[in-house]
Amino acid sequence: MPDRSTKATMGAEDIHERKVSMEPRDSHQDAQPRGMFQNIKFFVLCHSILQLAQLMISGYLKSSISTVEKRFGLSSQTSGLLAAFNEVGNISLILFVSYFGSRVHRPRMIGCGAILVAVAGLLMALPHFISEPYRYDHSSPDRSQDFEASLCLPTTMAPASALSNDSCSSRTETKHLTMVGIMFTAQTLLGIGGVPIQPFGISYIDDFAHHSNSPLYLGILFAITMMGPGLAYGLGSLMLRLYVDIDRMPEGGINLTTKDPRWVGAWWLGFLISAGLVVLAASPYFFFPREMPKEKYELHFRQKVLAGGASIGSKGEELSSQHEPLKKQAGLPQIAPDLTVVQFIKVFPRVLLRTLRHPIFLLVVLSQVCTSSMVAGTATFLPKFLERQFSITASFANLLLGCLTIPLAIVGIVVGGVLVKRLHLSPMQCSALCLLGSLLCLLLSLPLFFIGCSTHHIAGITQDLGAQPGPSLFPGCSEPCSCQSDDFNPVCDTSAYVEYTTPCHAGCTGRVVQEALDKSQVFYTNCSCVAGNGTISAGSCESACSRLVLPFILLISLGAAVASITHTPSFMLILRGVKKEDKTLAVGMQFMLLRVLAWMPSPVIHGSAIDTTCVHWALTCGRRAVCRYYDHDLLRNRFIGLQFFFKSGSLVCFALVLAILRQQSREASTKATVKSSDLQEL
């Protein structure tokens, strides 16, 4: 929003343009187009691409969260904190952006913020290049991976550990902390860089677009931007099919498939691609002027659309006024831009207290906090949940979210906006629609408690076998073996449907590779823990109920769609529930509360809940690292239970809002009746 001096300058320019328009001008001169950097339509195109790329780079981490955990040995609590850390930088600067928004060169600030986002993306990929190649077992660097290191060998023949305890404590742990520190720094920079992009871009469009075209431009912008998270999951699905060290593959290749639980995809490659897109999208912003000529004409498309109704001008004004809340939602309006910093600090507490005392505002924001907490946890950990619960690959889990869940959520947002506009819903009707959407979302989540796969038998972990790793039929079958406790090379006894953490723990002494046209299959032989010293296959046991992932994700997606319907009506409740002079602050407070109470803590809460269901942790240098196995039933109950808790909170808040609005309506009706009777008596 321009300040007073800017408005005065623009007003003078408008008067000058009206004077010039009275003079005859050459028709050829009129036909000459303005430069593309003086065209608001080109700015809309550039900003749509930039916000799309920004959401891709910020959402990509969520698509590869389980892969990053495996690569760097992180718990879900730590990875959740990492995913939420970009909110720290964002929150720390958003108030300054709101206050000084009209005092800076907005396009250049957007460009600088985008460059910082790209730098953050490069930093996120940096740990891959400065770390050692990924070793998916504990073989020594000079040995062939996945061979003798995991076999049952006598103590005298066992391969030595690759790292001593001294080197582990002094070198490996330092490198681990360095990698994690780099990623947390990158997430902070990602949040800081994203601060000016959306607010400055939308305010710039609204300032220099024709008042009737502005809602259309912003609608196009939001429609394109909403595809960003879906593309991020799609990109994650593609990248995680590639091996993490695709740029430095070992000479002998690898003996892993994407279905192997030790598989780590090329998580870093998506950050490089997204960062490159952000740099390309940021380049034009350094050539846009601080102020461009105001768009003077309405689009012919809009004229045709609105021709059948009221006059174009009135329709355009109506749409502009209805879209004004969307501008405020993005943090566009500056908080008291005509006040000095000292005056702003004096006024702020009084207005803040007045807004917080409003019951409708408080309840709607609390409901949005619950919904946002549910969304933040789902977006961060649902791919990992699907991987573990249904034994599917990370690539397929991301594909399901990107192609089904996110598109249906976008449809829900659009449907909610259309219902509010077409039906001209009152505040009470908006609250009823929100209540209905929350109720349907809650009901759709009930079957999720019963759709899932139980943890299959894992020798020594999910079976009550005392101290012995082998089945109870063969006690002590792997005692002669010198098995490393922290090794992980899962194998499956398909006859008994029992999984072992390594061939060594199954007592296997031999290894056979069967070559095929498309892939090779590895088997381990002479296994003392298997009936008849039989043969077992490499890899985890396949789940017998993986097919249930489709009805599960369908219910999740339908729930996301009906929950998204409440987005626009709940926002309208905030705008219509506070005083006109407090709307800007109310929207700003809503924005801050959602980030502080939902988007920051929710991934950490969900990650902590997931960690409590772990039954076997990997150990790195004596510390607890990534979880190898979960109790699937407990994981499902706690993850879905947490979602159910937040959905219930949202439902209760909307029910209270509807009850308050009905009470206010009855009181207003009673007052009107009393006033009417008093007038009749007079």
UniProtKB/Swiss-Prot annotation:
Disulfide bonds: 477-508, 483-504, 492-529
Annotated Pfam families: OATP
PROSITE patterns membership: KAZAL_2
Membrane topology: Multi-pass membrane protein
Domain Kazal-like: 471-531
Cytoplasmic topological segments: 1-41, 102-107, 207-225, 290-354, 421-424, 576-584, 662-682
Molecular function GO terms recorded: bile acid transmembrane transporter activity; organic anion transmembrane transporter activity; prostaglandin transmembrane transporter activity; sodium-independent organic anion transmembrane transporter activity; transmembrane transporter activity
Segments crossing the lipid bilayer: 42-61, 81-101, 108-132, 177-206, 226-246, 265-289, 355-376, 397-420, 425-448, 553-575, 585-610, 644-661
Annotated segments matching region Disordered: 1-30
Primary location group: membrane
Amino acid composition bias (Basic and acidic residues), ranges on this chain: 13-30
Domain notes: A conserved histidine residue in the third transmembrane domain (His-128) might play an essential role in the pH sensitivity of SLCO2B1/OATP2B1-mediated substrate transport. Transmembrane domain 1 (TM1) may be localized within the substrate binding pocket.
NCBIfam families in UniProt: oat
Name by which UniProt lists this protein: Solute carrier organic anion transporter family member 2B1
Organism in which the protein naturally occurs: Rattus norvegicus (Rat)
Lineage: Eukaryota, Metazoa, Chordata, Craniata, Vertebrata
This protein's encoding gene: Slco2b1
